[in-house]
């Protein structure tokens, strides 16, 4: 079942906060992307207005159901903007997380990273997520009474890997998120992101568009099938998942 989650809270240390409009998309087959743009970027943030962004296929995450509403997820991100940009004091390697369902329908994520090295002191973090209905234009919460939610929302994933680019687009219902990165660039000039919302009118609205090559990311997702190829401004994308 596909999922769309909005982050409500981020906490490192004693003071929780939320400065971003973070949405994470998870496809039916387990591919994922999380875009975390600042709501009110300032100063140096204006040139790259993201707290973080990451993405990966289902081959880059290990999911284990622990029972009683607890799931562990261990990530080896395909794209990690902090790693891509060589940000100082960045965790490298697998990130281990634990997800716990709350009675309210929210999901608590906890974990730890090692920004100073695997043999150094860890930094714990906590995030709170609200599942939302991907078939709706508005951010309508899912299962407020902890009822099981079954979604018929479409789940489509496109991927590009060639000598020059990596990229992933995930369509969950009406909500589309994607990235495209230039290989061997490792600057903000090599990063591109989109967030689109398909409207009742049949048109798509850009909620986020970042990067000089964003037009190489597909923005139409009709008449596709698994294994087919979509070309966007000369760049070929493979449809690796199609449930619609």
Curated annotation (Swiss-Prot):
The gene is HRI1. Pfam families: HRI1. Interacts with HRR25. May interact with SEC72. Keywords: Cytoplasm, Nucleus, Phosphoprotein. GO terms for cellular component: cytoplasm; nucleus. This is Protein HRI1. InterPro entries: Hri1, Hri1_N, Hri1_N_sf. The modification Phosphoserine is found at residue 143. CDD domains: HRI1_C_like, HRI1_N_like. Belongs to the HRI1 family. It is found in: Cytoplasm; Nucleus.
């Amino acid at each position: 079942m596909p999922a769309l989650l909005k982050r409500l809270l981020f906490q490192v240390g004693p003071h929780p906060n939320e400065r971003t409009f973070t949405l994470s998309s998870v496809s039916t087959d387990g591919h994922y992307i999380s875009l975390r743009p600042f709501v009110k970027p300032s100063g140096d943030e204006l040139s790259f207005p993201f707290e973080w962004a990451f993405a990966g296929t289902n081959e880059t995450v290990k999911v284990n159901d622990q029972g009683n509403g607890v799931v562990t997820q261990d990530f080896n991100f395909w794209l990690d903007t902090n790693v891509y940009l060589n940000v100082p004091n960045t965790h490298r390697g697998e990130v281990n997380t634990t997800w716990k369902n709350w009675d309210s329908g929210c999901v608590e994520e906890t974990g730890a990273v090692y920004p100073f090295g695997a043999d150094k002191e860890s930094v714990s973090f906590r995030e709170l997520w609200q599942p939302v209905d991907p078939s709706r234009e508005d951010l309508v919460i899912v299962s407020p009474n902890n009822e099981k939610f079954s979604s018929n929302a479409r789940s489509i994933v496109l991927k590009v890997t060639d000598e020059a680019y990596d990229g992933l687009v995930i369509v969950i219902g009406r909500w589309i998120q994607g990235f495209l990165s230039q290989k061997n660039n490792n600057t903000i000039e090599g990063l591109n992101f989109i967030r689109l919302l398909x409207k009742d009118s049949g048109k798509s609205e850009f909620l986020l568009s970042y990067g000089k090559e964003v037009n190489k990311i597909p923005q139409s997702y009709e008449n596709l099938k698994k294994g087919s190829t979509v070309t966007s401004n000369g760049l070929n994308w493979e449809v690796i998942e199609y449930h619609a």
